[in-house]
Design a protein with these regions (language model features):
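Conserved HGGG/HGGXW glycine-rich cap/lid loop of the alpha/beta-hydrolase fold
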Residues: 22-82
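Conserved hydrolase catalytic core segment
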Residues: 57, 61, 103-149
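Catalytic histidine-centered segment of alpha/beta-hydrolase-like enzymes
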Residues: 291-299, 330-339
């Protein structure tokens, strides 16, 4: 059996009016008089476990907390209402912040978690002291949009729950710990980190991935049929549908006042979030992996980085302080792959 909790980390159950959440914190923080609190929010097919090395590496005058989103880790596997975008997740995180009486916190969101913390900034700006977006989903969701964020098809065909690989979902559900092609371990090695990166904690990261609850109410969610290529559109339930561009748009952070300082950190070899992501159905079509692709004029791959940079440029033009850091030889997980650079950038943002 894999020991998933690192020495110096303790597990806490936090019951709010919305859910019972699983929370990780540093043992030393229990009695500490923290000047700042950092709240880490994981991404899709992961959990708070991934944040442990960075939590332990933060200075002692900070409080470090990582929250499991519903349906991940050991938080309640409550259904996800995707008609609200990621608000089920962001409202859950806000409820934990409120229950722990943390006040304004420094939010760090990874991948889908970046979308969650952007949504939290939109809905509860008083809770956000700063915002760190690591390998974040675009402010216009995942897939199905032109560069300006407009929908390529009215129903956002090719996005949402129908885009998941059924074999991968089945392997998650069965607890597959092998390194076979398509297994969670293989996906971690090929997509979560850059080629050649090796972690002594890989078994823990695989356990984290395997904590993902599967099904139409959780991961990946449901789907509907579409007359547009590739024949499906988002449903209204489950994780992948929360990031469908029909329901997800956090570009409104440009109008938030006051604007907290913002850090966007990402790897140059990110296989999941990029301008030619092979997790984007349109990119798979362009590469002839999915047949029948109607072409760039109808279904171009999403320019995720271009979109994010454009929104953050507007955020800066409207008075916000924005720092972008792209790390070379780094994939989707800078906090694991380039921890020193990540830590330095985060502490600079926090003024520590």
């Amino acid at each position: 059996m894999v020991e998933t909790i690192f020495p110096g980390i303790r597990v806490r159950r936090v019951t709010t009016p919305r859910l019972t959440a699983n929370v990780l914190e540093r043992e030393a923080d229990a009695a500490a008089d923290a000047v700042r609190t950092v709240v880490f929010v994981h991404g899709n097919v992961s959990s708070s476990l991934f944040w442990q090395p960075m939590m332990l590496d933060l200075p002692g005058d900070m409080r470090a907390i990582a929250v499991d989103l519903r349906g991940f880790g050991d938080s309640e596997p409550l259904p996800v209402d995707a008609s609200r975008g990621v608000r089920d997740f962001s409202d859950d995180v806000a409820s934990v912040i409120h229950e722990l009486d943390l006040g304004a916190v420094h939010l760090v969101g990874w991948s889908m978690g970046g979308g969650v913390v952007m949504q939290l900034l939109l809905d509860r700006p008083e809770l956000v002291a700063s915002l760190t977006l690591q390998s974040t989903v675009s402010p216009f969701g995942f897939g199905g949009t032109a560069v300006d964020g407009s929908l390529l098809a009215p129903d956002a065909a090719g996005t949402g729950g129908g885009g998941a690989n059924p074999d991968f979902v089945a392997r998650l559900a069965s607890g597959d710990r092998s390194d076979e092609p398509g297994s969670p371990r293989a996906v971690y090695r090929s997509s979560y980190v850059a080629p050649g990166f090796v972690s002594e904690h890989e078994d823990v990261w695989v356990e984290s991935m395997l904590s993902t609850r599967t099904g139409v109410d959780n991961y990946p969610g449901d789907a509907t049929t579409s007359d547009s290529w590739p024949g499906f559109a988002p449903g209204t339930r489950g994780v992948l549908n929360t990031m469908a561009p029909t329901v997800f748009d956090t570009s409104g952070i440009v109008g938030v006042e006051p604007k907290p300082p913002l850090l966007w950190i990402h790897g140059s070899q990110d296989a999941i979030v990029g301008d030619a992501s092979f997790f984007d159905l349109n990119q798979l079509g362009k590469a002839a992996i999915i047949p029948g692709w109607p072409g760039d004029e109808v279904a171009p791959p999403q320019q995720m980085l271009v979109q994010t940079r454009a929104v953050l440029d507007r955020y800066a033009a409207a008075g916000g302080a924005v720092t972008e850091l792209e790390l070379e030889n780094c994939g989707h997980s800078p906090h694991l792959e380039k921890p020193a650079e990540f830590r330095t950038a985060l502490l600079e943002l926090l003024g520590a």
